Amino acid sequence: MRAAALLLVACCTALSPHASVLHRCGSKTPPSAAEATAALRAIVNTRQDDWAPLYDTRWRPVFSVKPDADEGRFLTVRAEQEFRRDGSFTNAIRLFGLKFVFAGTYALKGSATTLVIERLRVRVLGVPLPSIDVREGKGIRALVESVRGGRKGGKGFQKRPNVYSWCYADDDVCVARGSSGSTAVWVRADG
């Protein structure tokens, strides 16, 4: 038991300088992109089993590194994502006077989270429009898939699954790799 506690303390101590840099990514005085990239690469392959800090908190993406990029970039998109303990999630994106809110369910297995997007809510200048069913093969998505068609070979329309592989999470910052291979830093959204 004591050995496990010492190992945990050693891991946390080793990660703390990198986590400190990642915490600053969402501040008014962020680190340089090179410093943030180095910290992200140092922390991305760590092992963590407690994902409780992710739940019931709104997160906003602030920094991202593509798989083959030498350096990451700070994100300017106004977006927030929340994972609730009941297995539901929302992902909100703001663009000028528009707000898109994707809602659905997720399954967390180990460090992998699979998202199933079910509804899209749109607000124009704060006025809500009717919710749209965007489940695969249902509603408007079925129409788009039938018009768009599929790949040769009769497999139908195929898309990359919505999967995050979580790398790190504490009360103020989390790191996840998406199905595209890009890795992002998310910070707790204020308010």
Predicted segments — roles?
Residues 1-16:
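N-terminal chloroplast transit peptides
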Residues 16-191:
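Soluble ligand-binding/transfer domains with enclosed cavities or grooves
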